[in-house]
Amino acid sequence: MSTKQLKRIKYLIIDVDGTLTDAGIYYDENGNELKKFCTKDAAGFFAAHQVGIQIMILTGRECAATTRRMKEMKVEYLIQNCVDKVTYIQNFMNEKNIKKDEIGYLGDDLNDLMGMSLCGFAGCPADACEEVKRKADYISEVRGGYGAVRDIISYLLKERGEWRKAISKVYEIGI
């Protein structure tokens, strides 16, 4: 994709299980579902926010751990228990008058393929299924749950020429 095309992206839709997490489902002794999120992805979220990209978490499961982590991450849109991601994305695009090329989608499995098709940019972790890898514009070298989202966002922002500016604001390191 060209820099011009990547600069159009205003929203990133991100799957949870297998993309932000390692796809494992863990339960505590009381039966509560737990998730392990990689703190490295936080830098990607914050960098995206610095350049005006809004984040939508779109997942088929509902989990209190996801709610808590996404609140900490100041995610603009948290959609859980979504059984029809395609219809949700289409409705969101219509309501907000968003064009396909203004949205990126990060996912890892078959249930993400149709959502990826609706968006102008698609990224996936290294351990995504082969069908998703074939659809992706960028395949991270990092596995889901181990910083793949940060890697994909850093790729996107580097290609747009905005990475250094974004992380400089995040970490106030003046580069």
Which residues are covered by each model-predicted region?
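Alpha-helical substrate-recognition element adjacent to the catalytic core
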Residues: S2-T87
